[in-house]
């Protein structure tokens, strides 16, 4: 789904199939969703209704003895002042409370109309590459600052990457599921980028 917002008694219609698929998967294995720039306002819906963990900013985890952290990455490496301001405004409790006060039909209509204009989506391949390079540099610095971390997973730029940034430390951006059906796997200290096939 393009956008998720948890209302008290309403589930956004446009994401129902994704939610159903995640609920089914959660019955087979533990899942934690990490909020991004379009879906960090989930409240307790995922956990209470579906048994899916939700981390609005970042999730720390240990899998098979590997310590890692996953975060979306929005608001971290943007260089234009308007993107930084927009992230602060959209994350502010007052903004969220005002939006929650809108009727869900109006709120979702508003998001549909504004989604193409808001945000910090890079406009050219050069901007995408520069944004991905800044994100990787940020991830490398974060891993250097936390040597106990073996894995840092980020998205946001949608530029797939699996990089060993230091001995025993990986930076992974799985890419975008909606643009090439990409994902990543990590096993035995190695990261692999892959593509879903029909």
Where are these regions (language model features)?
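Short low-complexity stretches enriched in small and charged residues
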Residues: 22-30, 72, 105-110, 126-127, ...
